[in-house]
Amino acid sequence: MYVAIEGVDTCGKSTQIQLLKAYYPQAVFTKEPGGSIIGEHIRDLVLFAPKKYGFTLDERAELMLFLADRAQHYAQVLLPHKDKLIISDRSVISGIAYAKSIDIAQSIALNDFVLRGMLPDLVVILELDEKSLKERIESKSHDNIESRGISYMLEIQKCFKNVVTQMNLKYIVLDATQDKERICAQIREHINILV
């Protein structure tokens, strides 16, 4: 079973991944981008290109880099562990949502090509209201994506639901302002139903 934890930056995805590790020690935990060796380099390039390398990526170049990472992630992580519980910090859903200026049908087709049809069995979307998102974003330094602003992040948050609906995937939306243990319990409840 393949579970994707989704949400905008600062919503608590990484926190939930850490909490879930205690409950599912046999599971394979991964992340996108960066779940493979090449993915770490791609992630660094996309997130820090303006500050570290002095240029901004074209949106199509960014999409293609994420697709390359996703293809490698499929080959190195998803396919070899397809019979195990896989829990991922982000997935194809983020890839499509963040490429919102690209036609969604085209983006879905490109991602389906690199994933060979292997999609999450459950997508957990951690959602923040504008006030909470603003507070969390202001309390940390920004990478290239986060520096696009609150309005951009809220648009992306809406895109997550649109993407899972378009792809006909099973998903739940959880209020990310709740206590982290409560959120973890809700995620576990849904995983345990499907495992």
Swiss-Prot record:
Annotated function: Phosphorylation of dTMP to form dTDP in both de novo and salvage pathways of dTTP synthesis.
PANTHER family linked to this entry: THYMIDYLATE KINASE (PTHR10344), UMP-CMP KINASE 2, MITOCHONDRIAL (PTHR10344:SF4)
UniProt name for this protein: Thymidylate kinase
Pfam families: Thymidylate_kin
Superkingdom to which the source organism belongs: Bacteria
NCBIfam families per UniProt: DTMP_kinase (TIGR00041)
Assigned GO CC terms: cytosol
EC number: 2.7.4.9
Catalytic activity as recorded in UniProt: dTMP + ATP = dTDP + ADP
Residues at which ATP binds: G7, V8, D9, T10, C11, G12, K13, S14
Keywords: ATP-binding, Kinase, Nucleotide biosynthesis, Nucleotide-binding, Transferase
Family, per entry: Belongs to the thymidylate kinase family.
